[in-house]
Amino acid sequence: MDIEKRLDLVKRQPTEEIVLLDELRKIFETVNRPRHYIGLEISGKLHLGSLILTGYKINDFLNAQVECNVFLADWHTYINNKLDRDWEKIKEVSEYYSEAFKFFCPGVNVIMGSSMYDTSNEYWKDFVKFSKHMTLSRTMRALTIMGRTKKENLDFSQLLYPSMQSVDIRTLDLDIVHAGLDQRKIHMLVREIFPKLGWKVPVSVHHHLLPGLSEPSKLGLTEDSTQDSSISSKMSKSQPSSSITIHDNESAILNKINKGYCPVGISQNNPILEIIRYVIFHEFSEFEIERDSKYGGNIAYIDPSELETDYQGKKIHPMDLKNATSRYVNKIIDPIRKHFSRWSIIDDL
């Protein structure tokens, strides 16, 4: 595969930013199979954002002949008070995450954080070296990577999180670091501090954050108003009514989407239209809306922008849009839903 085709795969939606594209081009010119990673905390049920959209981007990397690694950050999970800090539960849910990504992204490697720490002799030395370049105020500003604000009552271990995530990247010897836009701060920190230590600086690729089905919100997680809305509104397993999990049946998907925020004639920050653009159009070349003939009959789109324009012009009714979205989402989720139909751990999440 030539370099331009590989670059096009990386640039493809849901990618929103590459830091920097010229550096990525050079990597493809000089490294036969670049090494990628995306790090994930282990918590509740995987959903349309955390597995499907993320998995689509991982598959783009795999198709671009990149070695892809999913880093399951079990110690970060513990530090961030997920899964009640129960190590047995963290281990069980890690197995579920591992199976899900291996099923949805054939060829991906899964790395456990605790295993890496156990086998790396240099990790904690590098942690101290990196942290010597971090001020307390800079650490506090970076806490949005774990969904925390400076105003929260934090324990000391949570202040270790930004340095740990950065040194994970160093220890894994990566060419490409990949995450949602909510992790941008840590990648910019890496770009600033790694050169001071003489460490390899990886390219950062940030993908779109799929919003939950509720009305957009702003929690003050970052100074940038647009980014704050994107991060605050992202689909989250902590808000099950606003999140479409990979285990939801057809009825649950329809019910959740029908209750979703989708104001008439408003295309901006519309979660239904975002699901269509970033999830459905990634897999389907055409999006068909079924309508009674008295309302104009069925209509099909091959371009999400054209659909958004028609919706803004009130040519499409919200319920018609939602019904079509539910139908396509169910098709996408069905194979992995069936794959996990006998996994009892899911019932406890």
Predicted feature locations:
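Active-site beta-loop-alpha junctions enriched in small/polar residues
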Residues: 41-43, 75, 115, 209-212
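Divalent metal-coordination and catalytic microenvironments
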Residues: 47, 101, 232
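Short acidic-hydrophobic, aromatic-tinged amphipathic segments that line or gate anion-handling sites
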Residues: 15-20, 111, 244-246
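N-terminal catalytic cores of NTP/NDP-binding nucleotidyl/phosphoryl-transfer enzymes
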Residues: 14-81, 177-190
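Short, solvent-exposed polar/charged micro-motifs at secondary-structure junctions
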Residues: 48, 119-126, 213-218
